[in-house]
């Protein structure tokens, strides 16, 4: 038996296994009715949200229902109780005339969470941030529209946000959108798919994109003559969608390739996850130290980066002496540009991947692990998202 024959057999078995695993998760979601975002609020609970009171919620709901608006309700004994979805709450804020984020800023802000060290929670941070910013109780009034652009051929972000598009042949990927230079309408209709949390979309990636990245210069010369090879993501995708979203998050692999350079060239702000394990921390510092050279390399080739700043944050942090020591070293390096909130090492972040969920989209009623562990991870993700939002708000307003 030749080596190529064995490779093909293993590849076929791997493809079959991927399909089986995906079908198992999907069947479980169908059985448990877990294909929609589970979180709802009782009407009385809305009084705890910013700018809302029990009285003005009652008044707004009455007015909206008189005009024909239908709120979500669920049976509770012999009566029907309000079960407010996040869209219901956003509509209440809109009815009351509360300004949205897009009323302050007309164009999307591009966030890139990056580190050349693999396994430092780049993707988990990105997808958790996307879902948490949308669903955070204190950010619902902003009605944030969020897009995740997956440029990692491993398509992990796609798996978390829309797992059906993370296996098999996917033709409408972020890399293809960049190369084909399609219209805004085609991007929205053909290349962007919704996640389980309404208001958060993803532009998928595929393993085939790795071949595109490796031949990027030649492909750009063939399909996009005259266009700067580092500006393709910004010009062919992001600039066309900047009025349709408030935040665009880019996820790329841990490789110094064309996709990472395009992500850097398109980003308004960079977030660097810093894992506290000594070897990983050292590798991360090497990346941070060489970052100015990388930005200069992109600029020298005719594409100006528009980075406002690079913010560091700790990922996978636990209550250990060596982790605390690395945290203090990170504060020395980043100073005031160190995020004061970190993403801890929690079981919830890891277990959610078993059902292709984030800690925000995972339903506690069907979650396979500890409900308390999921709750702690969700709180950590929400705190992280609020800290990121507040830092960006400070930067944009100054």
Swiss-Prot record:
InterPro entries found in the cross-reference section: AAA_dom, DNA_Partitioning_ATPase, HTH_54, P-loop_NTPase
Keyword Cell inner membrane: no
One annotated GO molecular function: identical protein binding
SUPFAM superfamilies (UniProt xref): P-loop containing nucleoside triphosphate hydrolases
Entry keywords, A to Z: Plasmid, Plasmid partition
One GO term of the biological process aspect: plasmid partitioning
Alphabetical list of Pfam families matching this protein: AAA_31, HTH_54
Domain of life, per lineage: Bacteria
Function: This protein is essential for plasmid partition. It ensures the proper distribution of newly replicated plasmids to daughter cells during cell division. ParA is trans-acting.
PANTHER family associated with the record: P-LOOP CONTAINING NUCLEOSIDE TRIPHOSPHATE HYDROLASE, PLASMID PARTITION PROTEIN A
Similarity comment text for this entry: Belongs to the ParA family.
Name this polypeptide is given: Plasmid partition protein A
